[in-house]
Swiss-Prot record:
Protein name: Phosphate acetyltransferase
Family named by the database record: In the N-terminal section; belongs to the CobB/CobQ family.
Keyword Acyltransferase: yes
Gene from which this protein is expressed: pta
Top-level taxonomic group: Bacteria
Length: 708
C-alpha cells in the first residue's frame, strides 16, 4: 500500500515546486524500494501556472512519476457541490493508485490562490488520512523573527487540529525577495550584487519546537537562481527570429529604451536585455549603430508589432549580423513589464541540468529520520476519515451487488437515490408500487429511471404472501381479513418479500415513522438466533473522522445485560465497515468518581463485555469528554485503554442517545447515516423522514453490505 504525503503551504513565497521535485528525488533515490515504472503518483490541488510541478514532471520525470492534471480547487468554494465533486475525484485517484504506487505526493493550495485554502487543505488531508508536511519561509534568521514565526505556526496548528503531522520544512531562508519590495528589474540588480552562493545556514536546534518537528532548514542559494534568455521568453510566450547560441545566457539587466535612451550608453553590463517599442525603432537603430558597445546587448524585445513589416527588415538584418537575439510581440511595453513581475526566479522548467542541481541541493537537507512513517507508532489510533468511509461503503456495496427493497416508491428522494444507485452499481434497487405512477413521478421531476430497475406492483403479488404471513403470525389472533388489511401497507408487504429471500435487504422510513419500519421487521424477520435484542447505531461523519453512536433509536432503557449486547453488536458492526472499535460506555461519571443506579448499570455492562469479549478495547463508565480528548483523559482516566480516542459510543439509555446524536448532527451540521439496525436475521434499515438523497444512498449501501 502506498504512503500518502501532502505538502501544505503556510506562506506565499516558499518554493513549493522546488520542494515537491526535491522530495520526489529524495524518495526515489533513498526510500522507494521498487524502482518500477511510475512508482510515484503526484498531483497538485491547483492548476494555475505553466511553471507548475506537474509541467516539469511530465517533461522530465514521466517514467518514474505519474501525474493527475485535471484537479483544480482554486475555482470552487469550500463545501460547495463542485468542491465535493473534486474531493471525491481525489479520493478515487487515491484508491485507484494506493496499491499501484509506493508514494502519493499531493501539493496543497497556496494561500493566494483561493480564499478557502486553509479549510480545503485541512479537509483534503484529513479525508485522505495523509501525512502532512508544512512549508514555510524565513525572511531572516534573527532569534526574534524565528520566535514570532514559531508562534504563528503553533497558533495555526492549534486552530486546525491536524492529524499525522510529519513536520515543517523552512525554505528560502534569508531570501532577499521575500519582502516583495522589489520589482523584476530591481531583482536583477540585487542578484548582480550578491556574490556569495548561499546565505547563512540556520541550524535546526535554533528552531527546536515542542509543538512540531523540523524536517529541514533550507537557506536561499544565489547559485541556483537564474534568469536565462530562453526562460524569460518561454515565460513571456512570445515569438523569436534569431535565438542563436545565446539562449542559455544569463540576463543581468533589463533596459527600457525610451526618450531617456542615453541610459543605454552608460551601462556597463555584459548581458543586457533591451525592451524597445516599435514606434522608437529608428531612434534605437541609430543609437545601437553609432554609440553602443554591441557586446552589451544580448537580446531585444520589440513591443507593439502587429505583423512583420518590410520597414523593419533592415533592423533584423542588422541585429542578426551582430548575433543579437530578436523577439517580438503585439503587447505593449507596459504589458510585458507587468507580466515579468510574476517570473519565478527559483525554478527553470526548461533545463534538466538546473533542475537536477536544485533537487540535489535541497534533498541534501533531508534525512531518513525526518520522513519516518510515524503511523507505525500509533496503529491503535488510526483515524477513519468520513470521505474514505463513504467511498468504502460504495465500493463494498458494488462488490456485493445485492437486491434492496424500497417500498416508498412514490417519494421523489427515493426515486433519485434509486437512479443514482443504478448508475453507480451500488445495489440492485427493487421498487414496490404502480409502475405507471412511478415512471410518471420520475418523468415529472427529471429523474431518469432505467428500464432495468425492477418495479413490483403490490396489487399483483399481495395474494402470494398471504399464506406465509398467516403462518408467521399464527397464534397472534390474526384472521385472513385482518392479514389482508395489514398487507395493504407496502412496508409490511416488503418485509414479507425480504423474509421470503426474494430480496436481500429493505430500506424504508423516508415518509413513515421508525415504528412503521421496525415493527414489521420484529414481527416477520425476527431477531438473529445469536442476538437477544435488536439495537441501532448511527455513523456520525465528523469533519475528520467517523464515530458510531448507539443505541439512539430502539431500546428505551436497556438493562446492563442488554447494554452489553448493544456494545458488542456495535463493535462487530464497526469491524464490518473497516473501523477498529474503541468502545466508550458513557455515563455522567468517569471510573469511580460517581454513584447511582445508572452508573452501576454501565459499570456492570462494561464488566460483562470484558468477560465475553476480551478482544475488544473498552472503558466505562466514562464521560464523553474523557472518551474523546486525550488531555481530559489524562486528568480523569489516566489508565484508560481508549486514551481519549474512542470511536464507538454506547449511551446508557435512549433518552441520552437520541438527544446526543441530534444535537451533534444539527449543531455541527454533519452527515449522520442511520439508524442501522443490528440483531435482525436480515437487514432492515430505517430512514429519517428528513433524510437527504445522499443519506438514502448511503443507507442503501449499508444495507447491501449487511446482507449475507
Amino acid at each position: 500500500m502506498s504512503r500518502i504525503i501532502m505538502l501544505i503551504p503556510l506562506d506565499k513565497d516558499i518554493g513549493l515546486t522546488s520542494i515537491g521535485l526535491s522530495i520526489i528525488y529524495f524518495f526515489y533515490q533513498k526510500k522507494i524500494k521498487k524502482k518500477s515504472v511510475q512508482s510515484i503518483l503526484y498531483f497538485s490541488c491547483t492548476q494555475n501556472s505553466s511553471n507548475s510541478t506537474s509541467h516539469v514532471i511530465n517533461k522530465y520525470f514521466s517514467k518514474i512519476v505519474h501525474t493527475v492534471d485535471y484537479i483544480d480547487f482554486s475555482k470552487v468554494l469550500f463545501n460547495s457541490p463542485e468542491y465535493s465533486f473534486l474531493l471525491n475525484k481525489v479520493i478515487d485517484e487515491h484508491y485507484n493508485n494506493k496499491f499501484l504506487r509506493e508514494l502519493i505526493l499531493i501539493e496543497g493550495i497556496k494561500n493566494n490562490y483561493c480564499i478557502n485554502s486553509e479549510e480545503m487543505n485541512y479537509d483534503i488531508s484529513q479525508n485522505l488520512n495523509a501525512e502532512v508536511i508544512f512549508i514555510a519561509n524565513l525572511e531572516n534568521s534573527s532569534p526574534e523573527y524565528i520566535k514570532n514565526k514559531e508562534k504563528k505556526i503553533n497558533f495555526f496548528l492549534k486552530q486546525k487540529k491536524y492529524k499525522n503531522i510529519l513536520g515543517v520544512i523552512f525554505n528560502q531562508i534569508n531570501s532577499p525577495f521575500l519582502e516583495n519590495k522589489y520589482d523584476f528589474i530591481k531583482k536583477l540588480i540585487v542578484l548582480k550584487k550578491i556574490k556569495n552562493e548561499t546565505k547563512t545556514i540556520v541550524p535546526k536546534k535554533i528552531l527546536k519546537n515542542n509543538f512540531f518537528s523540523i524536517i529541514a532548514c533550507i537557506p536561499w542559494n544565489r547559485n541556483i537562481v537564474t534568469t536565462r534568455v530562453i526562460d524569460l521568453f518561454n515565460f513571456l510566450n512570445i515569438q523569436h527570429t534569431n535565438l542563436v547560441q545565446k539562449k542559455n545566457h544569463i540576463i543581468e539587466e533589463i533596459i527600457i529604451f525610451d526618450t531617456h535612451h542615453l541610459n543605454l550608453l552608460n551601462k556597463h553590463s555584459l548581458n543586457t536585455l533591451v525592451i524597445v517599442s516599435f514606434s522608437r525603432v529608428d531612434v534605437f537603430l541609430n543609437v545601437l549603430n553609432c554609440n553602443v558597445n554591441r557586446s552589451k546587448v544580448k537580446c531585444i524585445i520589440l513591443t507593439g508589432i502587429l505583423k512583420l513589416k518590410k520597414n523593419i527588415a533592415s533592423l533584423y538584418k542588422f541585429l542578426i549580423k551582430r548575433s543579437i537575439s530578436i523577439f517580438f510581440t503585439e503587447k505593449n511595453t507596459i504589458e510585458i513589464l507587468s507580466q515579468l513581475q510574476n517570473f519565478n526566479f527559483d525554478i527553470s522548467v526548461k533545463d534538466i541540468t538546473y533542475i537536477k542541481k536544485l533537487q540535489r541541493y535541497i534533498s541534501n537537507f533531508f534525512c531518513h529520520s525526518s520522513f519516518m512513517f510515524f503511523k507505525k507508532k500509533y496503529n491503535i489510533n488510526v483515524i477513519y476519515p468520513p470521505k474514505e468511509f463513504c467511498y468504502n461503503l460504495k465500493l463494498l456495496s458494488q462488490k456485493k451487488n445485492k437486491r434492496i427493497k424500497l417500498p416508498e416508491s412514490y417519494e421523489i428522494r427515493i426515486l433519485k437515490s434509486v437512479a443514482i444507485c443504478s448508475d453507480s452499481n451500488i445495489a440492485q434497487c427493487v421498487l414496490l408500487g404502480d409502475p405507471k405512477k412511478i415512471y410518471s413521478i420520475a418523468n415529472d421531476n427529471g429523474i431518469n429511471l432505467k428500464k432495468n430497475i425492477e418495479i413490483i406492483d403490490p396489487i399483483s403479488v399481495r395474494q402470494e404472501y398471504l399464506a406465509r404471513f398467516l403462518e408467521i403470525r399464527k397464534g397472534k389472533n390474526i384472521n385472513e381479513f385482518s392479514a389482508k388489511k395489514q398487507l395493504e401497507d407496502n412496508t409490511v408487504l416488503a418485509t414479507l418479500i425480504l423474509e421470503s429471500n426474494h430480496v436481500d435487504g429493505l430500506v424504508s422510513g423516508s415518509i413513515n415513522t421508525t415504528s412503521d419500519t421496525i415493527r414489521p421487521a420484529l414481527q416477520i424477520i425476527k431477531t438473529n438466533p445469536q442476538s437477544l435484542l435488536v439495537s441501532s447505531i448511527f455513523f456520525m461523519l465528523l469533519p475528520n473522522q467517523v464515530l458510531i453512536y448507539g443505541d439512539c433509536a430502539i431500546n428505551i432503557n436497556p438493562t446492563a445485560e442488554e447494554l452489553a449486547v448493544i456494545a458488542i453488536q456495535s463493535a462487530d458492526s464497526a469491524k464490518m465497515f473497516g473501523i477498529e472499535p474503541r468502545i466508550a460506555m458513557l455515563s455522567y461519571s468517569t471510573g469511580c468518581s460517581g454513584f447511582g443506579c445508572q452508573v452501576e448499570k454501565v459499570k456492570e455492562a462494561t464488566s460483562i463485555i470484558k468477560n465475553r469479549r476480551s478482544d475488544l478495547i473498552i472503558d466505562g463508565p466514562i464521560q464523553y469528554d474523557a472518551a474523546v480528548s486525550n488531555k481530559v483523559a489524562k486528568l480523569k482516566a489516566p489508565s484508560s485503554p481508549i486514551s481519549g480516542s474512542a470511536n464507538v459510543f454506547i449511551f446508557p439509555d435512549l433518552n441520552s442517545g437520541n438527544i446526543a446524536y441530534k444535537a451533534v448532527q444539527r449543531s455541527s451540521r454533519i452527515v449522520s447515516i442511520g439508524p442501522m439496525l443490528q440483531g435482525l436475521r436480515k437487514p432492515v434499515n430505517d430512514l429519517s423522514r428528513g433524510a437527504s438523497v445522499e443519506d438514502i444512498i448511503y443507507t442503501i449501501a449499508l444495507t447491501s453490505i449487511q446482507s449475507e
